[in-house]
């Protein structure tokens, strides 16, 4: 089952960190070579095989302890082959740690379950696994002097460090700070709620489900069919608004942001709710991915084998930002959505961008392989076809007519309404959204017209 991200090709090992508890063996190929996939990887491939009815019954219990609070507990059990050809495999794991870098804590769980049934020449199996996790982060690709100017100087960096923060050590992380989420109760008393908050956090959960049929037609002919689905949900947080508010020690001044947000009425938008000058947003990357794999292998002799297969995939990735933490405010402002009816955004509402990436992928391969123990050679013929579509829900819609197209012409625009008294003095104002209107051949079109299409 392929696990490389369908949009960028990356592999996120944290999505199945506890799989070692039920791993039977790992097949590793370095560089281009004979491999039963539609598009052989130039860099190489890795295939992880889990335990099943063909393996011995047994279990493992493992406790790992490491530096910086690293702790991991793992359990795994494989039943082997039971009566009537049944078998099952179970695994679970929990990990946590503080991290070498300040406030880069981590916590994660892993679960795995597989049930198998031998039915004649078939082995049927269903499996499910996932690893919900979250961890603190810091920005990367920064020079050493960002953390420790003395250490950078010892390595030969002759840059001007006069504007740098005082030496904090290479474990320094500027993205966290102390925060007291105080509130006033009905009696006017201050209720304190103190915490340490890392503004850069990552959280994700990508469960995967598969249904497999391994069919041994005879001792020379083998067919495998797999259906699978994967559902990913999660994202990473960061600051929005005033992103350059650091104190003398280099930490982000969260308390100052919270205090300002807690008393920030903007009459243009609300008379009784506080507007956020700084808040946390989360960049979300959800996806739904399903596919099917069918491969066959025929052994002509001890030296010659033929294999081939089909690989079909459908992937939909949903990408957007949302308001994650208002830091004492009631709402934030965002004007990125060209179709919105209000710039006011509450907790959990989308900001910044919102688009879908849809990938349809198909591939096929055939391979002849020769090996006599001294010389090995293979001939591989493969091909694939992919289609990508991007849908942007924040861009204004196109007006598509029979004789012309107006690009990104229909959505909403901001209007400011001013209020004056009888003497002409300005006494108030408020922001509103109005629908864009395009007139064509005497007909008015808006974003709700049938002819309005997403970009």
Protein language model regions, located:
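Signature of Gram-negative outer-membrane beta-barrel scaffolds
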Residues: 307-455
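Flexible, surface-exposed loop regions and adjacent strand-edge segments
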Residues: 105-110, 141-151, 156-158, 240-254, ...
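Short strand-turn segments of transmembrane beta-barrel domains in outer membranes
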Residues: 35, 45-81, 91-102
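Outer-membrane beta-barrel transmembrane strands
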Residues: 193-238, 276-307, 318-319, 348-382, ...
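Acidic/polar loop-and-plug regions of large Gram-negative outer-membrane beta-barrel proteins
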Residues: 124-210, 237-281, 338-345, 421-424
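Outer-membrane beta-barrel proteins
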Residues: 64-72, 95-118, 138, 175-214, ...
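Short acidic/polar hinge/loop motifs at secondary-structure boundaries
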Residues: 2-30, 49, 154
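Transmembrane beta-strands of outer-membrane beta-barrel pores
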Residues: 63-69, 79-81, 94-98, 119-121, ...
